[in-house]
A protein has these predicted regions:
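Basic nucleic-acid-binding interfaces
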Residues: 1-133
């Protein structure tokens, strides 16, 4: 099985480990909301041709290991993931979010962590992400 993405003029394997935290580090990514947030993030990745290798949450942080295209910047990926998941979360779970975020339609902190990874360390990062939550 070839793990590389084949394009007309390139062959690549670009992967990044992303971590988002909720605004004010609120511990709200639980239960049904946790599953919904993961689904929103996954669907956004599929729509943009990013491939989720692993994703897990632990009340507040969300860890995602994804493979992306060389035409996409990490900043762009993070922005799209946060925007779409926030919008959908407020549409579907406004009662929950209004308890924590008064008058502001926010979900994520402005900050994020991103680390590019090589294939040598992928298994280690996957185990780490699987053990979250």
């Amino acid at each position: 099985m070839d793990i590389y993405q084949h394009r007309r003029h390139n062959k690549n394997l670009l992967m990044v480990h992303l971590i988002f935290v909720t605004k004010y580090r609120k511990k709200i990514v639980l239960g049904d909301f946790r599953d919904a947030v993961k689904q929103y993030l996954f669907n956004t990745c599929v729509k943009n041709h990013w491939y989720v290798k692993r994703m897990e949450t632990d009340q507040d942080p969300v860890h995602i290991l994804l493979q992306y295209n060389p035409t996409d910047s990490i900043t762009h990926i993070v922005s799209i993931l946060k925007q779409h998941s926030t919008y959908l979360s407020w549409q579907q779970h406004s009662a929950l979010l209004e308890q924590h975020y008064w008058k502001k339609h926010v979900l994520w902190s402005d900050n994020y962590f991103a680390a590019s990874i090589g294939t040598v360390s992928q298994a280690v990062i996957e185990r780490y992400i699987e053990n979250q939550g």
